[in-house]
Design a protein with these regions (language model features):
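Active-site-adjacent structural elements in folded domains
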Residues: 340-345
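WD40 beta-propeller repeat fold
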Residues: 102-314, 318, 322-325, 329-330, ...
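Intrinsically disordered terminal extensions that flank WD40 beta-propeller domains
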Residues: 1-164
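Calcium-regulated, polybasic anionic-phospholipid
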Residues: 335
Length: 485
């Protein structure tokens, strides 16, 4: 059996065969299969937009004319290159009809369905945003309600074809609709409870912009209007009643000079704050006057980008903004003077790198939470805005290194539970974090996770009156956590 082998090789082969016989007698493979239960591989949800595979062109193989026996053509090495004209990517400043902005405008039946959805949102019962709202006992019990939130494959859908930059849940009481904005100007409306393969399982996709839609929210005064601000230098309003994407802000001369906008915040039912990225200014736009020119321009920074905007809920003249170099400041609109640089009311100290999010608490504005690239989640006490420099009440380590291909993490305060923060996470298993800020401390309250959540959800939003939390990832998918039916 071991002919031709040396003595050492014979001993080695004999030992191997003895061990194999021992394992077979012990039935180790059967024991292993019993101790390790079979777990089927999770298949991602196929709801929403269908994934389009890019067809790569197969080039013919290169052949050498010299080796083939042919003549090598003379090459003029000094032929000047022909420069291709640059594409004019300036955003349109005209109102768009629903059909003009709708991606599947050729499908007449789908167009009728999307118009019906907008018509229904026009008459959706409005959520009460004032302080008289009284939640049910189960709603006010934070620990209990968070424990009831689950996610399944049916609650995951691809809403936009690329990276998600903003998410906003419609605050209506009866219909659950989520607006999602993407990298190349897409805005998708997802009717979460609708399941119909013929019409993308309730996903209605528009493209009113040409560049990333960095900020989007439903109008607090009229929830039938969705406001979007894009890097293409314009802000638009989806008016469900009129069935149009109307202009909110856009200056032709500013766009022709390479201008762009990054975010917005609502100051009152008719006025909006919009940041100009390359000038360091924040403009005040009054919809009663018109969208061509802002009513007030406030020079906040010199050669810095106001990356985030938040208006004080009790003092609408006060707003908060952070920069791409680490500064975080509170300004007062009443202190704006022509084109001169504004003096901040207060500075929130401690930031050394770019801010991805800074927001006032929704109930009183007495707290501010910030996320910055130096891997910190900070909490500030802003009860007294006359303090020139405000130090953080609490700062905890938080991994904010999303890298190049993921949208930076953002914070949001719970609209109906004071002192509760929600944000995305880089931790594994993938999760959405809930933080409790009672007493000025940052304490983890819960981690929302599930088998259907397999990616980083950088952007999150919360329904004001229902236990629903939604997160968007960087491949266009939305994940919804809600109580099981």
């Amino acid at each position: 059996m071991f002919d031709g082998l040396c003595e050492y090789e014979m001993i080695r082969m004999r030992n191997i065969m003895e061990r194999q016989a021992l394992f077979q007698s012990l039935d180790m493979e059967d024991v292993k299969s019993e101790l390790t239960p079979s777990r089927p591989k999770h298949v991602p949800s196929s709801r929403g937009l269908a994934s389009v595979k890019k067809v790569t062109e197969v080039l013919p193989p290169r052949k050498s004319a010299r080796l083939a026996g042919g003549l090598v053509p003379d090459i003029d090495r000094f032929v000047p290159l022909v420069e291709e004209p640059e594409e004019d990517n300036i955003a349109s400043l005209e109102d768009l009809s629903i059909k003009d902005a709708f991606v599947r405008a050729e499908d007449e039946e789908f167009v009728i369905r999307t118009k019906k959805l907008l018509f229904d949102l026009k008459f959706e019962p409005k959520t009460r945003h004032d302080s008289t709202f009284t939640p049910s006992p189960s709603f006010s019990d934070l620990d209990w309600s968070l424990s009831q939130l689950t996610i399944t494959d049916d609650l995951v859908a691809k809403v936009v074809p690329d990276r998600i930059f903003s998410v906003s849940l419609h605050p209506g009481d009866t219909r659950l609709v989520c607006a999602v904005a993407g990298k190349v100007g897409h805005v998708g409306l997802w009717d979460i409870m609708t399941r119909d393969d013929r019409f993308s399982n309730g996903v209605h996709l528009y493209q009113p912009h040409t560049r990333p839609v960095n900020t989007m929210n439903w109008d607090q005064a009229d929830t039938s209007r969705l406001v979007t601000t894009s890097y293409d230098g314009t802000s638009r309003v989806l008016d469900c009643g009129l069935g149009q994407w109307r202009m909110l802000y856009g200056e032709k001369q500013y766009l022709e000079n390479g201008g762009w906008t990054s975010c917005h915040a609502q100051q009152s039912p008719n006025t909006w704050l919009i940041s100009q990225g390359n000038t360091g200014s924040v403009v005040l736009v009054d919809t009663r006057v018109g969208w061509e020119l802002p009513s007030t321009t406030m020079k906040c920074f010199e050669r810095l980008n106001p990356k985030s905007l938040s208006v004080h809920p009790k003092q609408p003249n006060v707003y908060l903004t952070g920069t791409n170099k680490g500064g975080c400041f509170i300004f007062d609109i009443r202190m704006a003077r022509d084109s001169s640089l504004m003096t901040p009311v207060s500075e929130l100290s401690g930031h050394s790198r770019s801010l991805s999010s800074c927001v006032f608490s929704r109930d009183t504005g007495d707290q501010v939470a910030t996320l910055a690239s130096e891997d910190k989640l900070r909490l500030y006490d802003t009860s007294y805005l006359d303090t020139p420099v405000i130090s953080p009440q609490c700062a905890v380590r938080h991994n904010n290194q999303t890298g190049r291909w993921l949208t930076p993490l953002r914070l949001t305060w719970h609209p109906a539970r004071p002192g509760v923060l929600v944000c995305g996470s880089m931790m594994r298993p993938r999760q959405i974090e809930v933080w409790d800020t009672e007493g000025g401390d940052l304490r983890p309250a819960a981690q929302l996770t599930g088998e259907a959540l397999g990616s980083v959800t950088s952007i999150v939003d919360i329904h004001p009156t229902r236990d629903v939390i939604v997160g968007g990832n960087s491949s266009g998918r939305c994940h919804v956590f809600m109580p099981a039916e």
